[in-house]
């Protein structure tokens, strides 16, 4: 079974830039507010892109997905390698949505300016393996997300409302 080998993220929510090398099992631990939920959110974003639900995910609020909003970060990028496959995209804010500044399968450019992935459209034409939601490797991706919501959790403590960074 193939697995995601690496994922590179730029400009997604609290993640300015990150590159992760993944193994068969990955455990991510962090304090509340440290960005662990946003890291998991990248996999949700990827799933929404690959299943043609990006615009539902954006929900007319692209700034909530961009690192400190479009004034600071006008676009976000995600690059994934999975065995011999590679897939990546850059999404930029345009009015109340995100559109593909580019989308690529390996080194092959799929397109620009579209609102939903065109990956499945190129699958029959591509000489290279195509990363798409129907492939068995995506069926084995499982994400479990646990929260500390106990009474002593930092999320339930009094905080300075002006401390937003």
Q: At which residue positions do the language-model features occur?
A:
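Phosphate-binding P-loop
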Residues: 17-23
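Conserved lysine of the Walker
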Residues: 35-36
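Hydrophobic residues positioned within well-ordered beta-strands of beta-sheet architectures
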Residues: 5, 18, 76-78, 87, ...
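Electropositive, glycine-dotted interaction segments
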Residues: 83-165
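Short strand-coil-strand connectors
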Residues: 10-14, 81-83, 106
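Conserved P-loop NTP-binding catalytic core
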Residues: 40-96
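N-terminal pre-Walker A segment at the start of P-loop NTPase domains
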Residues: 1-15
């Amino acid at each position: 079974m193939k697995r995601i080998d690496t994922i590179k993220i730029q400009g997604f929510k609290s993640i300015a830039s990150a590159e992760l090398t993944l193994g068969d099992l990955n455990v991510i631990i962090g304090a509340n507010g440290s960005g662990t939920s946003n890291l998991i959110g990248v996999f949700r974003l990827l799933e929404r892109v690959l299943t043609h639900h990006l615009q539902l995910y954006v929900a007319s609020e692209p700034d909530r997905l961009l690192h400190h909003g479009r004034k600071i970060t006008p676009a976000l990028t995600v690059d994934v390698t999975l065995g011999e496959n590679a897939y990546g995209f850059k999404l930029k804010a345009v009015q109340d949505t995100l559109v593909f500044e580019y989308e690529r399968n390996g080194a092959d450019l799929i397109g620009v300016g579209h609102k939903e992935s065109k990956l499945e459209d190129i699958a029959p034409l591509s000489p290279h393996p195509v990363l798409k939601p129907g492939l068995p490797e995506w069926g084995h991706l499982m994400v479990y997300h646990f929260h500390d919501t106990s009474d002593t959790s930092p999320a339930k403590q009094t905080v300075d409302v002006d401390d937003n960074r």
